[in-house]
């Protein structure tokens, strides 16, 4: 009996070290960023069982076998559709401004199409204005409505949007709604999901959370896009979820969420439509390619329109493109660079680019919320402040609520707005969308919004920052070490 237990003990020990060695080898062979690899190895060797389970759950990008097969299967038809779109040469911009030229070339070569011109674009910064405009457009819809949101929280004006969408479905408009399973858990637990389906709306719970499949697909891979397309001509995107700020997370202690949305008319809706069709096919297996370009692209005034490129990121889309786009935009800055984001945990490359821009004389400002709904990200963000301040970057802490806007403005002409936070999750994991706009008029509108944010912010004083308590510095460094995993 003693011999038996001895053999079992040695087998357990051997299996333990084989498992650790196997996971270690897998981490090293994945060619991931060094800080990320080191953070994972530290967790695994300090807390082996916890670390191994965590790594197998969220350490690698698993879309899931069925979704991965759908993603591969959809690309031949999607590629053909994109080639057909290229035949509509009149919608594509032939030239871009000097500050935007490199970024637009990058997007064209990586995504296969150039930026589209002739779009009408309006910035909306008030949640009531966004929802009222959306309700009007839904009421005027003639053919189809497609929506995707990370969060749909019942209550307030969000219910009015839901009512208008159900009314549209009842009068024969083809309505599709895709919501992230984790972000919209309150919606799927409410009567609204059944009510919408009964009204004729196709409601899809994207990336459904299932603990039984935790090792087969990353549960923290989320559908983070916020998009609305109406009649293949009107489109919305930006940072705002389908929530009424007066009813959303009121117990979080951060104030109302402050967002920005863009309402567009023109060919950009077609580009966003193909992104939505890919998401829909990956999730449901059903192919819903937008109508042929020559059918849905309506006349437009080229002289007064905006040139826009759409960047889609996430599994199945060009890898690392949004990260490359942010780096390219940052290095293109010559006069000033303004960034707004609720969550700031940049890659080493992006941090270096921002600091380098400030050190070569660019006026660099980053606007962050003073209070954050994520304790982990809040502390991790602070770990970067010293390096930014030393480089000459201005850090503004917004005091008017939780600033949720994701925007970048370069030299008043090149703008990026969308759903991407400046953190690892948005840059390399989630399904996201970003608009790249080459236009001084839109740049002026975005600058006015950012100036308003600055007027409601407090500039971080570098002299006071270095005097913060020791315990805060220790906490910041702790979270900084694990920032590659956040």
From Swiss-Prot:
Keyword flag Transmembrane: yes
UniProt-listed Gene3D superfamilies: Endonuclease Chain A (3.30.870.10)
Topology class, membrane: Multi-pass membrane protein
Active site: 224, 226, 231, 404, 406, 411
InterPro entries: Cardiolipin_synthase, CL_synthase_A, CLS_N, PLD-like_dom, PLipase_D/transphosphatidylase
Places the protein is found: Cell inner membrane
Primary location recorded for the protein, binned into one broad class: membrane
EC code: 2.7.8.-
Transmembrane segments: 3-23, 38-58
Keywords from the UniProt entry: Cell inner membrane, Cell membrane, Lipid biosynthesis, Lipid metabolism, Membrane, Phospholipid biosynthesis, Phospholipid metabolism, Repeat, Transferase, Transmembrane, Transmembrane helix
Classification via SUPFAM superfamilies: Phospholipase D/nuclease
Catalytic activity: 2 a 1,2-diacyl-sn-glycero-3-phospho-(1'-sn-glycerol) = a cardiolipin + glycerol
Function: Catalyzes the reversible phosphatidyl group transfer from one phosphatidylglycerol molecule to another to form cardiolipin (CL) (diphosphatidylglycerol) and glycerol.
Family: Belongs to the phospholipase D family. Cardiolipin synthase subfamily. ClsA sub-subfamily.
Name of the molecule in the record: Cardiolipin synthase A
Organism: Salmonella typhimurium (strain LT2 / SGSC1412 / ATCC 700720)
Phylogenetic classification of the source organism: Bacteria, Pseudomonadati, Pseudomonadota, Gammaproteobacteria, Enterobacterales
């Amino acid at each position: 009996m003693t011999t038996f237990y001895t053999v079992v003990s040695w087998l357990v020990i051997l299996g333990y070290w084989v498992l650790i060695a196997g996971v270690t080898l897998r981490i090293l062979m994945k060619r991931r960023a060094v800080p990320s690899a080191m953070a994972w190895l530290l967790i695994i060797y300090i807390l082996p069982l916890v670390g191994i389970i965590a790594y197998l759950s969220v350490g690698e990008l698993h879309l899931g076998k069925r979704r991965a097969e759908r993603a591969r299967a959809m690309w031949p038809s999607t590629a053909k559709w994109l080639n057909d779109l290229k035949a509509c040469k009149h919608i594509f911009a032939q030239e871009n401004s000097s500050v935007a030229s490199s970024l637009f070339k990058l997007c064209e070569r990586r995504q296969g199409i150039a930026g589209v011109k002739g779009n009408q674009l309006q910035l909306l910064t008030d949640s009531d204005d966004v929802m009222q405009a959306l309700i009007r457009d839904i009421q005027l819809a003639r053919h189809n409505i497609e929506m995707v949101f990370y969060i749909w929280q019942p209550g307030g004006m969000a219910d009015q949007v839901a009512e208008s969408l159900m009314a549209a479905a009842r009068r024969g408009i083809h309505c599709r709604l895709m919501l992230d399973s984790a972000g919209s858990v309150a919606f799927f637990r409410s009567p609204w999901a059944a009510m919408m389906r009964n009204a004729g709306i196709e409601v899809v719970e994207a990336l459904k959370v299932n603990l039984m499949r935790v090792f087969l697909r990353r549960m923290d891979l989320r559908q983070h896009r916020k998009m609305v397309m109406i009649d293949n001509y009107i489109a919305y995107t930006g940072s705002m979820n389908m929530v009424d700020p007066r009813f959303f997370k009121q117990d979080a202690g951060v104030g109302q969420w402050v967002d920005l949305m863009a309402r567009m008319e023109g060919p950009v809706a077609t580009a966003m439509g193909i992104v939505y069709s890919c998401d829909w096919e990956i999730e449901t297996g059903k192919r819903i390619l937008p109508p042929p370009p020559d059918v849905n692209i309506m006349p437009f005034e080229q002289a007064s329109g905006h040139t826009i490129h759409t960047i889609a990121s996430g599994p199945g889309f060009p890898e690392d493109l949004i990260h490359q786009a942010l780096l390219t935009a940052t290095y293109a800055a010559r006069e000033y660079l303004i960034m707004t984001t609720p969550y700031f945990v940049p890659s080493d490359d992006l941090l270096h680019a921002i600091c380098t821009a400030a050190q070569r004389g660019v006026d660099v400002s980053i606007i962050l919320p003073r209070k954050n709904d994520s304790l982990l990200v809040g502390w991790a963000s602070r770990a970067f402040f010293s390096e930014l301040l030393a480089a000459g970057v201005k850090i503004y802490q917004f005091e008017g609520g939780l600033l949720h806007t994701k925007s970048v403005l370069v030299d008043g002409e090149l703008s990026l707005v969308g759903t991407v936070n400046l953190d690892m999750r948005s840059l390399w994991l989630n399904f996201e969308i970003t608009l790249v706009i080459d236009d001084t008029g839109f740049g002026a509108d975005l600058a006015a919004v950012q100036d308003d944010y600055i007027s409601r912010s407090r500039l971080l004083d570098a002299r006071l920052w270095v005097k913060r308590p020791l315990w805060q510095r220790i906490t910041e460094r702790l979270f900084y070490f694990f920032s590659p995993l956040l």
